[in-house]
Amino acid sequence: MVFSKGGFVTVPVVIAAGRRKIPTIIHESDMTPGLANKICIPSATKVCCNFPETVKSLPADKAVLTGTPIRQELLNGSKEAAREFCGFTDDKPVLMVIGGSLGAASVNENIRKILPELLKEFQVIHLCGKGKMDESLKDTKGYVQYEYIKQELADLFALSDIVISRAGANAICELNALKKPNLLIPLSANASRGDQILNARSFERQGFSMVLEEEEITESTLLNVIRELYQNRESYVHAMSESSHMNSIEKITGLIEDCVNKQ
């Protein structure tokens, strides 16, 4: 049995397995398969997909909508631990802003511009990326900023009422599994192959997310969308609760067992 997540090193392995009639499962996280997976699909037994649109574009006997497994430790966060870690109170909702590992300059800049207005309604956790801290905001009440968080991330998610994030496949699947109402700001097509835009629009169509493209960001637009997201948060939680992305691990392991048993 071969299981592949893509990448150029997997291509000869999957092709060789196909020639030897060894069951092979590919997992594609993004809406449009990357080059390695495109090459491997003819040799694969099944293709696990993250989006309904991807399933429709692939051979019907191969494509399966499974979603993407997430880190299980993210499901076990503690609100109380996060509140103590951040020094927050329990009298305002919490907005978490995730700028990505390198930080999203336009997101960081505009969040900080509207921070005085945001702090009237929210407490804000800002994961701003390496080298993107603003020391002038260090002691601002109700606002904490970190370059990067690992150990406490599950706790911060548990405390957060709504989240702003990029639209990488793994990130949005984590938000979906955690049922966190979210605003996605995908990487622009100028800075990527456009997969984040496609990912975000699919989640928007399914009722999981709001989307604001980077070119559309202004102070007033960002503030209004955040308020709208919070006001309608329950509808997003409901949609995510009904999502086919739930139980991804069970779906994929079941598929592996089926393929092995049919040898």
Feature roles, as predicted:
Residues 1-20:
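An aromatic- and histidine-rich active-site surface loop
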Residues 1, 146, 158-173, 180-181:
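Acidic donor-binding loop of glycosyltransferase active sites
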Residues 22-23, 161-162, 179-187, 208:
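Structural loop-to-beta junction motif characteristic of Rossmann-like glycosyltransferase folds
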Residues 234-246:
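A short, well-ordered alpha-helix in the C-terminal region of glycosyltransferases
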Residues 42-43, 155-159, 177:
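Alpha-helix C-terminal capping/helix-to-coil transition sites in glycosyltransferase folds
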Residues 18-80, 88:
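Active-site-proximal region of nucleotide-activated glycan assembly enzymes
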Residues 79-81, 88-165, 197-199, 205, ...:
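Donor-nucleotide binding loops and adjacent catalytic segments primarily
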Residues 245-263:
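C-terminal alpha-helical cap of glycosyltransferases
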